[in-house]
Curated annotation (Swiss-Prot):
Keywords in alphabetical order: Cytoplasm, DNA-binding, Metal-binding, Nucleus, Repeat, Transcription, Transcription regulation, Zinc, Zinc-finger
Protein name: Zinc finger protein 383
Pfam families: KRAB, zf-C2H2, zf-H2C2_2
Role: May function as a transcriptional repressor, suppressing transcriptional activities mediated by MAPK signaling pathways.
Places the protein is found: Nucleus; Cytoplasm
Zinc finger (C2H2-type): 170-192, 198-220, 226-248, 254-276, 282-304, 310-332, 338-360, 366-388, 394-416, 422-444, 450-472
Family: Belongs to the krueppel C2H2-type zinc-finger protein family.
Gene name in the database record: ZNF383
TM regions (residue ranges): none
Keyword Disulfide bond: no
InterPro entries noted in UniProt: KRAB, KRAB_dom_sf, Znf_C2H2_sf, Znf_C2H2_type
Family annotation (SMART domains): KRAB (SM00349), ZnF_C2H2 (SM00355)
Notes on the domains: The KRAB domain is responsible for the transcriptional repressor activity.
Domain KRAB: 6-77
């Protein structure tokens, strides 16, 4: 086959808007990388071709789906005219998502000179498999063998076998997925064994795919060429911009068949479905705790490593999660966006509001199996259980005294440092505990919330009431 007879359309795949919407960010990035590389290869080898619309769209970061997609035609004008009325649409159901770009057909000068019709169609089929066209069929319009020149009929029949899953000798024993080439099979196995052979030279982080390294490098360069016209936010990948734009449009194309809940991102739907299945595929190698999301595991591992990458610029305190830093910063700003509709009290975090609302509802969902005592918060239950276990993991390095709670140790350490951060606005007296300041303030307010049920006498502190009750019991 002559070089001049090879066109960009022979080594490309077009998508309708519906098909494009079904691809996730990794698939879209892969498609973009492969298409741009193929066009670059054709140009660099002197094969003149006007810039296709899809390439212009990809370079601008726009969605490249094609309206009124044309049927794919043959590789040479003679074959095209001979077979114009004899098209056969072979519906090919492709396998689930392939995250990594595999060794597709090499677009070298030699390869283009000697590639057959079947070679190019095989390349197109393999690209479709990589993109993992989900839960359906990808239409591949090709010519029937009887109308093809004799020299390519055998190649076409071989291709037809591949496209009908009849020639996939390399099967994965882990998940049953089959591949037509050993190189694809080897690349796929990295998913199961967790092999990451592609290293970022900037930070040393490893990835399982070369395309992932390319995307990761933009973190170091700060490159964000794809900007949202609605709000001006910029992104490193066109697929991230496409996902972001759903915030403005409100589009949620991914719906859970179990409960009907819809999501903007396919990955969010996958995470959500694990609520129904109970699946927790991400386990911590240190303690064995399992999670439904890889991001949850990533955050959890920092407990073991002690890594706290999110630092407050106001006070220098560091956190394992960015969300915790955001909550902490509200201490400095005084922001309390979560308000209780019952009493109007406001909180800096949604979880604090949820815990507070249980005061009104009386809900105590966390029960101690040892004594039956119930608590409004899981953290309170964990602290309580240490009483039964005799566990006191928080030890003072100054005197060796141990405590069941970290907050108790923190308060105790003020005895050694003589720190008294809680000051009375009335008289200026300072205290090392907030509870001590609260009791002291009752001297100024005259408040006595602790009443004796025997005689009605009231006291400003619970300890005073207990001492008083000894009079009635003769203790």
């Amino acid at each position: 086959m002559a070089e001049g007879s090879v066109m960009f359309s022979d080594v490309s795949i077009d998508f309708s808007q519906e098909e494009w919407d079904c691809l996730d960010p990794v698939q879209r990035d892969l498609y973009r990388d492969v298409m741009l590389e193929n066009y670059s290869n054709l140009v660099s080898m002197g094969l003149y071709t006007p810039k296709p619309q899809v390439i212009s769209l990809l370079e601008q970061g726009k969605e490249p789906w094609m309206v009124g997609r044309e049927l794919t035609r043959g590789l040479c004008s003679d074959l095209e005219s001979m077979c114009e009325t004899k098209l056969l649409s072979l519906k090919k159901e492709v396998y689930e998502i392939e995250l990594c770009q595999r060794e597709i057909m090499g677009l070298t000068k030699h390869g283009l000179e000697y590639s057959s019709f079947g070679d190019v169609l095989e390349y197109r089929s393999r690209l479709a498999k990589q993109l993992g066209y989900p839960n359906g069929h990808f239409s591949q319009e090709i010519f029937t063998p009887e109308y093809m020149p004799t020299f390519i009929q055998q190649t076409f029949l071989t291709l037809q076998q591949i496209m009908n899953n009849e020639d996939r000798p390399f099967e994965c024993k882990k998940c049953g997925k089959a591949f037509s080439q050993n190189s694809q099979f080897i690349q796929h196995q990295r998913i199961h064994i967790g092999e990451k052979s592609y290293e970022c030279k900037e930070c040393g982080k490893f990835f399982s795919c070369g395309s992932h390294v390319t995307r990761h490098l933009k973190i170091h360069t700060g490159e964000k060429p794809f900007e949202c016209k609605e709000c001006g936010k910029a992104f490193s990948c066109s697929s991230y911009l496409s996902q972001h734009q759903r915030i403005h449009t409100g589009k949620k194309p991914y719906e859970c068949k179990e409960c009907g809940k819809a999501f903007s991102y396919c990955s969010n739907l996958i995470d959500h479905q694990r609520i129904h299945t109970g699946e927790k595929p991400y386990a911590c190698k240190v303690c064995g705790k399992a999670f439904t999301k890889s991001s949850q595991l990533f955050q959890h591992v920092r407990i073991h490593t002690g890594e706290k990458p999110y630092e407050c610029k106001e006070c220098g305190k560091a956190f394992t999660q960015s969300s915790k830093l955001v909550q902490h910063q509200r201490i400095h700003t005084g922001e309390k966006p979560y308000e209780c509709k019952e009493c109007g009290k406001a909180f800096s975090s949604g979880s604090a509001l949820t815990n507070h609302q249980r005061i009104h509802t009386g809900e105590k969902p966390y029960d101690c199996k040892e004594c039956g005592k119930a608590f409004t918060q899981s953290s309170q239950l964990r602290q309580h259980q240490r009483i039964h276990a005799g566990e006191k993991p928080f030890e003072c390095l100054e005197c060796g005294k141990a405590f069941t709670q970290n907050s108790q140790l923190f308060q105790h350490q003020r005895i050694h440092t003589d720190e008294k951060p809680y000051e009375c606005n009335e008289c200026g007296k300072a205290f090392n505990k907030c509870s001590n300041l609260t009791r002291h303030l009752r001297i100024h307010t005259g408040e006595k919330p602790y009443n004796c049920k025997e005689c009605g006498k009231a006291f400003s502190s619970g300890s005073d009431l207990i001492r008083h009750q000894g009079i009635h019991t003769n203790e």
